[in-house]
Amino acid sequence: VELPELHVFQRQARARRHGTQELLEGAQLRAARWSLDDRDAEGALERLAELPQGAARRTLALRIRLKASRLAGRTREALDTARLLGKHRAFSSDAARSLVRGLAIELLNQAHDPAQLQAAWLALDAQDRAMPDIAVHAAQRLALLGGDGAQVRQWLLPVWQQAVELPGALAQPQGQRLIAALESALAGLDAAWLARIEAAQQANPRDAHLQYLAGMACVQRQLWGKAQQQLTQAAPQLQDAGLQRRAWRTLAELAERRNDAAAAAHAWKQAALAH
């Protein structure tokens, strides 16, 4: 065979191999999709595992993997796949963010003790952990599972720093969840965190949520006078019934501590009226 003809022959052979490979990959993808349609998640994942690496990372294969992983309860694998789909721009940025957030929260919810939750938290990437919804949810779950309060506060610190820099952020539902998460971790509050809370409150003196948190922090530090002052100002202004009720109850207990029966009766009445 002459040299030019040899090159033509080689190109044709490569094209045939490429075409055959594409046919095989297409058949594997169809088989995976059929397995998924039959709700055979493990079967679909097995078909996908047989694909070459390049084909397995294509958008269609990743979409099937995402659905199969979720169906199989493999949340961590689904989360990794969702991130890849986001990088491939398979979804809008908002949709990708929402999907990752939902899967991350699902992964955190599968933890049933602080050690499992710590492992799930570390399985998230830094971008996931920086999402306020994820960080607050993780912190609330850690508190619910009896985790260390200092660890809860550490997870919340980046979110806290973002929130106090945005005027009015703590009045939003997300900000109120942050306040509730921090309140659940006030036991053992150190001086550094008290200083952070008080500095934020002083910078935003009209923010009832910060006044409330500062007051509850002062209760934990046994700074009774400061606690009474902050909570007295915050209680009538709070829009959240649960926070308002707790503020009035705490004021009632502080009044009882100083043997002020009239103030205690008034605070208990206000707590009962909060709704």
Feature locations, PLM:
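Conserved small-residue packing positions in alpha-helical repeats and bundles
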Residues: 1, 10-13, 31-33, 49, ...
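Membrane-proximal soluble helical/coiled-coil segments
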Residues: 1-71, 77
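Alpha-helical adaptor scaffolds
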Residues: 2, 24-37, 104-105, 164-240
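Alpha-helical repeat scaffolds
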Residues: 5-15, 41-52, 75-88, 112-127, ...
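Short coil turns that delineate tetratricopeptide repeat
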Residues: 18, 22, 56, 90, ...
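Alpha-solenoid helical repeat scaffolds
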Residues: 24-30, 59-65, 80, 93-102, ...
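Structural motif corresponding to the intra-repeat A-B loop/turn of tetratricopeptide repeats
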Residues: 38, 72, 110-111, 145-146, ...
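C-terminal non-catalytic interaction modules
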Residues: 229-233, 237-275
